[in-house]
Regions:
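Gly/Trp-centered helix-boundary motif
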Residues: 1-72, 76, 81-83, 101, ...
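Generic hydrophobic transmembrane alpha-helix motif, especially the helices
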Residues: 35, 39, 69, 79-80, ...
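Helix-loop junctions at the membrane-solvent interface of multi-pass transporters
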Residues: 10-17, 77-81, 106, 110-111, ...
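Amphipathic alpha-helical segments that mediate coupling or scaffolding at interfaces
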Residues: 49-52, 56, 77, 91, ...
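Amphipathic cytosolic juxtamembrane alpha-helices at the membrane-cytosol interface
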Residues: 43-58, 62, 82-89, 139-143, ...
Length: 256
């Protein structure tokens, strides 16, 4: 995952132009000039794969960060406010019952495709899971002796939340954020494949697979390259989440 991040950041130094077309080099096999060959429009598949990683990582990280921040705020307040809890958790339950892809398609259909709205469309349905997780942690921590002692000692609630409650939610939040990031990368690829995600002029793994699916027999690398990168990236993010869980909860590792 770190290697992929470095490669994407340094892409302008070694990769070609992912948008430049070579009409006389359509569907070419891998060569020293084009390592992964070219697609049906003569574009460099290697350059498009590397620059497509930027989109996937950016959408995944920003969607996970957005869902984590919003879910953290909702979960903390819901865990401490009974009246707020009853109302907001029912809304979260309603959002969780809607498939992520369908909700994202509905939002994008109303506003039009774009990276910003794509991040929002992915983050919204992922937020309820984060909020419920944080809420469960807060409910378990709020009754502990050190929290009650701080409140009895005259500490204000915001200070108690900041010093005692929020730190307890960070481990679970980081693990959940990794899960959301992996899910967001897959969702972005699926939406782009369907034509409602990243605009067609921007290289992404999803729209690369969609535009090359008819040429699988002629130029398999046009699909294999983005597909393999997508699978490896999602696997790496999931393994990162597993590693964080084992680090924060060694008992979970022993149980496995």
């Amino acid at each position: 995952l770190a290697l992929l991040t470095i490669l994407t950041l340094a892409a302008p130094l070694y990769a070609g132009d992912p948008l430049k077309m070579y009409p006389f080099k359509r569907l070419q096999p891998p060569s020293p000039e084009m390592w992964f060959g070219s697609d049906n429009l003569g574009r460099d598949v290697f350059a498009r794969t590397i620059f497509g990683a930027r989109i996937s990582l950016m959408v995944g990280l920003l969607s996970a960060a957005s869902a984590a921040v919003i879910g953290l705020l909702i979960g903390v307040v819901a865990g401490y406010s009974r009246s707020f809890d009853n109302v907001v958790m029912r809304v979260m339950d309603g959002l969780m019952s809607i498939p992520t892809i369908l909700l994202a398609i509905a939002l994008i259909s109303l506003t039009g495709p774009g990276i910003g709205i794509l991040i929002v469309a992915i983050a919204i349905p992922e937020t309820p899971a984060v909020a419920r997780l944080v809420r469960s942690v807060v409910l378990g921590v709020r009754g502990r002796p050190y929290v009650e002692a701080a409140l009895c000692g005259g500490a204000r609630l915001p200070k108690v939340l900041w010093r005692h409650i929020l730190p307890s939610t960070i481990p679970a939040l980081m693990v959940q954020a990794a899960t959301v990031c992996a899910s967001a990368i897959l969702t972005e690829a699926g939406l782009s494949f369907l034509g409602v995600g990243v605009p067609p002029e921007i290289p992404s793994w999803g729209n690369m697979i969609a535009s090359s699916r008819l040429y699988l027999a002629i130029a398999p690398m046009t699909i294999f390259a983005p597909g393999a990168c997508l699978a490896v990236t999602v696997l790496a993010v999931n393994l990162l989440g597993d590693g964080l869980r084992d680090m924060f909860d060694p008992r979970a590792k022993r149980r496995r």
